[in-house]
Design a protein with these regions (language model features):
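Two-component histidine phosphotransfer core
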Residues: 2-138, 146-150
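Two-component histidine kinase transmitter core
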Residues: 152-157
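Intrinsically disordered, low-complexity acidic/proline-/asparagine-rich linker or regulatory tail/stalk regions
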Residues: 160-162
Length: 162
């Protein structure tokens, strides 16, 4: 199922705010008008926001999640999901896309290996938006995490406008 990015993310965050409290999960959206009606599959954005809440939230401070979506060239969009969470080191960020790290781990409390969601998202983006699309993670311990998705709409297998 496809839904515009802002609506999909707001809907998911409603559940997280109910779970942790309105004051613990804060979100901003900066979606340029020329892409605000662009549709993306639910299983691309939602797991990134879910990871921000699950892995980025500290013990005391509110987690801020900023979602920006802008045109990136003529036929592409750039989606950035940034948080002010606990962050991660370069090695951990690199392992997010390592197929060996993405294998399910029954002993994990979350039921998966490190990076299962990011590995799956990266594969979906290539499959659904073509070889010129990519996923990148920028993070540092104590500085939060930013996930960037570059989606080549000219290669999309979806009807991308409402």
């Amino acid at each position: 199922r496809q839904m515009c990015i802002r609506d999909r993310t707001k809907r998911y965050l409603t559940f997280e705010k109910a779970r942790f409290g309105e004051d613990r999960v804060l979100a901003t959206f900066d979606v340029s008008e020329d892409v605000e009606d662009t549709l993306v599959p639910a299983f691309v954005i939602q797991p990134i926001v879910e990871n921000a809440v699950r892995h980025g939230m500290g013990d005391d401070d509110a987690l801020r999640i900023d979602v920006t979506v802008h045109q990136d060239g003529e036929d592409a969009i750039l989606i950035a999901v940034a948080d002010n969470g606990v962050g991660m080191d370069e090695g951990t960020a690199a392992r997010l896309f390592d197929e060996r790290s993405a294998r399910p781990d029954a002993s994990s409390p979350q039921g998966g290996g490190a990076g299962v969601a990011m590995h799956n998202i990266s594969e979906r983006i290539h499959r659904f938006y073509g070889p010129h699309s990519y996923t990148r993670v920028e993070s540092a311990p104590g500085k939060g995490t930013k996930v960037l998705l570059h989606l080549d709409l000219s290669e999309s297998i979806f009807d991308i406008q409402e």
